[in-house]
Swiss-Prot record:
GO terms for molecular function: metal ion binding. The keyword Transmembrane does not apply. Keywords: Lipoprotein, Metal-binding, Methylation, Prenylation. The gene is HIPP10. The keyword Protease does not apply. Residues 1-68 form the HMA domain. It comes from the Eukaryota. It comes from Arabidopsis thaliana (Mouse-ear cress). This is Heavy metal-associated isoprenylated plant protein 10.
Length: 111
């Protein structure tokens, strides 16, 4: 199974880059080597990543595996579907007040 591994190390100059490319090319099963960012080496293929890390540590003291994943990783959806927020229906805060008979009431008042 093809997988993609990203290696990262501290000091990355032209000479170190050439040595790293040479070491990685010697591994059987390596299909793609990509050096776009400074200090990061992206290798795709079917190989033992731990042995490759050990060989790269001979070139540079600090080498770390940053990411490991399958070759054809699906692109992440940058605009996720937003769920509509449910409407909040508010009830009455207090029970309704009953009107008491007063001066202007229609009820009969006995005097």
């Amino acid at each position: 199974m093809q997988e993609t591994v990203v290696f990262e190390w501290g000091s990355f100059d032209v000479r170190t880059k050439e040595k790293a490319m040479k070491v990685v090319c010697e591994f059987p099963g390596v299909t793609v080597i990509d050096v776009k960012e400074r200090g990061k080496l992206k290798v795709t293929g079917q190989f033992d990543k731990f042995i490759m890390t050990k060989k790269l540590k001979k070139i540079c003291d600090y080498v770390d595996i940053t990411a490991v994943g399958p070759e054809g990783q699906p692109a992440q959806n940058r605009n996720p579907v937003k769920k509509p927020e449910p409407k909040v229906i508010r009830g009455r805060p207090y029970p309704p007040q009953k009107k008491t008979p007063g001066k202007n009431s229609d009820e009969c008042i006995i005097l």
